[in-house]
Swiss-Prot record:
This is ATP synthase subunit b 1. One of its GO terms (cellular component) is plasma membrane. The gene is atpF1. Coiled coil: none annotated. F-type ATPases have 2 components, F(1) - the catalytic core - and F(0) - the membrane proton channel. F(1) has five subunits: alpha(3), beta(3), gamma(1), delta(1), epsilon(1). F(0) has three main subunits: a(1), b(2) and c(10-14). The alpha and beta chains form an alternating ring which encloses part of the gamma chain. F(1) is attached to F(0) by a central stalk formed by the gamma and epsilon chains, while a peripheral stalk is formed by the delta and b chains. Keywords: ATP synthesis, Cell inner membrane, Cell membrane, CF(0), Hydrogen ion transport, Ion transport, Membrane, Transmembrane, Transmembrane helix, Transport.
Amino acid sequence: MLHEAETWVAVAFVLMVALFIYFGAHRMIGEALDRRSARIRKELDDARQLKEEAQKLVAEYRSRRESAEREAQEIVAAAQADAERIAQEAKAKMEDFVARRTKAAESKIAQAETQAVADVRAAAAEAAAAAAANVLSQTVKGSIADNLIEKSIRELGGKLN
């Protein structure tokens, strides 16, 4: 049995384990495993904390985005309302402008009609006065005729104008 290799491997193994125990290798291995376990636990805690912070940031950014979208919608709605109000004001101003221009045109037309009527009356009065002067000058002779014609022309001109 002493000549077999397996025996010597077993003896060497037992001696080596005894030496490890004697020098405290099991404590060092346990402490190393404990340190590694603690480091892994810390890394997991850090990762969990980072994940929570990331989730908070994501929620905050979503909230900000939604707020910005609402604000943008409010701005668009306000702009549409302003545009509609401006269009209505422009339409009202245009209608007022057209009404004033129409009234001014009607006033000018009425003035032109009045002027035309006055011009026609004046022309008719002049024609009537000339005709009356012509008739009187042919029928009445002398200084009486001249005085009568002048008087009639003055009276006729005053009455027709």
